[in-house]
A protein has these predicted regions:
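Extended, charge-rich alpha-helical interface modules
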Residues: 1-75
Length: 75
């Protein structure tokens, strides 16, 4: 995998994680209730699932596509 593709995917997954964290924080701190999403715990669960999938993808990228261990620590 070339470096640009690797970094693009990594940023994509990291952005997904940040987005989910922000949404969960907003749900819990601001008590936001969206009419279509009355099930707050269900929404939080879906967001956690999305985060877990993104973290798994980051782990796979690092495991199989990082060239050396020094580079893995930087990323």
């Amino acid at each position: 995998m070339n470096d640009m593709l690797f970094r693009t995917l990594l940023k994509r997954y990291e952005a997904t994680i940040e987005d989910c964290m922000y949404k969960i924080q907003s749900l819990s701190e601001n008590n936001i209730i969206i009419p279509e999403h009355v099930d707050i715990t269900g929404e939080a669960d879906k967001l956690l699932q999305t985060m877990a999938e993104a973290e798994d993808k980051v782990a796979v990228l690092r495991k199989y596509y990082v060239k050396n261990k020094a580079e893995a620590k930087i990323l």
